[in-house]
Curated annotation (Swiss-Prot):
It comes from Helicobacter pylori (strain ATCC 700392 / 26695) (Campylobacter pylori). It comes from the Bacteria. GO terms for biological process: cell redox homeostasis; cellular response to oxidative stress. The gene is bcp. Disulfide bonds join 46-85. GO terms for cellular component: cytoplasm. This is Putative peroxiredoxin bcp. The active site is at residue 46. InterPro entries: AhpC/TSA (IPR000866), Peroxiredoxin_AhpC-typ (IPR024706), Peroxiredoxin_BCP/PrxQ (IPR050924), Thioredoxin-like_sf (IPR036249), Thioredoxin_domain (IPR013766).
Amino acid sequence: MEKLEVGQLAPDFRLKNSDGVEISLKDLLHKKVVLYFYPKDNTPGCTLEAKDFSALFSEFEKKNAVVVGISPDNAQSHQKFISQCSLNVILLCDEDKKAANLYKAYGKRMLYGKEHLGIIRSTFIINTQGVLEKCFYNVKAKGHAQKVLESL
């Protein structure tokens, strides 16, 4: 599987947030960006990961980082997810999976013993110059947010 590499310029994107406002990577680069791709709102692993990132929100802020989650869900789904789980991370809509493809976070993966196409749970730390500092592919949701925080 092809992957992005540390030291590369992070691919720019323009996606809508849960309020329908378009946001690009460049809009976020006043801080380090923790960009995480996840498969679907309101599913067990994705909920755990989002809640963990939200619980550590102030710790990420202390390290001058903003946390942004991206999935193929629409704005309405994100709004519901944010409300139900009391999330404080930014969620962006990648319904056509263009951003996931740019970040090599969409492709073949195993689910319940079968291979299928889908979002590959991945996280990227991007510095204020837009350069990839860390790339995590095929991550497990449990404990991942803490691991990312420790990597900053």
